[in-house]
Structures are given as structure tokens and as C-alpha cells.
Amino acid sequence: MSFNGSKCKREPRLKKFQELTALHSLIGEDQLAELLDISTKTLRKWIKDENIPKEMILGARLEQIFESIAKPKTSEHSSFHFIDLFAGIGGIRRGFESIGGECVFTSEWDKYSQKTYRANYKDNHPIVGDITKVNTDLIPDHDLLLAGFPCQPFSLAGVSKKNSLGKSHGFECDTQGTLFFDVERIIEAKQPKAFLLENVKNLTSHDKGRTFKVIKQS
């Protein structure tokens, strides 16, 4: 039987590096560096060099961060659990917390909105960035899904601007218009008791009502 010692040594390091880059993609550089108690400069160097220190390989810190996303600690006193998608700075969340809800997962891609959100809410779970990259296994079970998905592809002003620029709108806008289908993907996988989708008035009449019909049928 042959034994490749160097390969065995590489495998744990590779696994940890893959975990590190996955978290970097999920929650961003600033949050990850803060959670690891290192500078963003150090984090960039680890990723650039594809190398992380021995103590990180032997420790469980990366697994703990994944755990805080998928299974955050919750209060015994909350009436229900909800997730906050396309969260902005947390305006919708405020109302549902006021009636006893507890937020167990947050997604917001804009780093400036993230910064304000984190100042508004001291959570035990990090904010996930691009929801399109999130496997539903990483989303905790919840009773209610909140999603204020982008309105620009559907609003009167947004559609008018895109038309003037010769750009697609509605579901044809592949940067923002298709994000509803990520909401659908999560609802299908997690089966919350209820969901609330917030958008503009024109959503119901966009594309002669066909857009809203697709949403209702989904």
C-alpha cells in the first residue's frame, strides 16, 4: 500500500482554503475579516497566496461562521422567525420585530447598506451578500420570508429609463429582473408558513400584467 504524505497534508489546507473563499464570496471581505479578527489586508494576502496559517487549518473558526449563518442561536421569547432578503438598511424588519418576530437570516448585496444595517441591528448572524450564490441549505428554517426585491426593472421610471437606453426590463433584465426567481427558489426549498414580497405598484401592470401573472403562478 502506498502512502502519499504530502497529499494528506495538502488536503486539509485545500479544504480550509475552499471554505475561506466560499465565505469571502458569501459575506464579503469586511465582515469575514472582522469575524476572523484579522485585517482585510491579511485576508487579501491569504486569498491571493492561496495559503492560510496552520492555526486556521486546525481550528474550527470557519465552520463556526458557516454555523452562524445556517443555524443561528435564537431567543426562546420570539413569537416567530423570519428572514430578510434584499434587506436594504432593515426598514421592513423593524415592523416585524415590533410584533415579536426574530430575524434569523439577512441578505443584502450593497456594502454601504450592509454597514448601516449592521449599525441598526446587532445580530448573531453575518449578512449574506449575493443571494443568487446562496445554497438553500445555508438558509435556516423560518416561519416568514420577507423580500423587497429590486423594483427598477418594473417601475415606471425604471422601465422608461431602460427603454431610452435600449436595455431590457422586467424579467428580461438579467441583472435585477430575475431576482424574484431566487425568492421562489428559497420559498420552494424552505416552505415558510407565509411570505411578504414588497415592490412597486407598476409590478401588477408591467408587460400588460404578464409579469405579475408569472409571479402569482409561481
Where are these regions (language model features)?
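Conserved active-site and SAM-binding loop architecture
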Residues: M1-S218
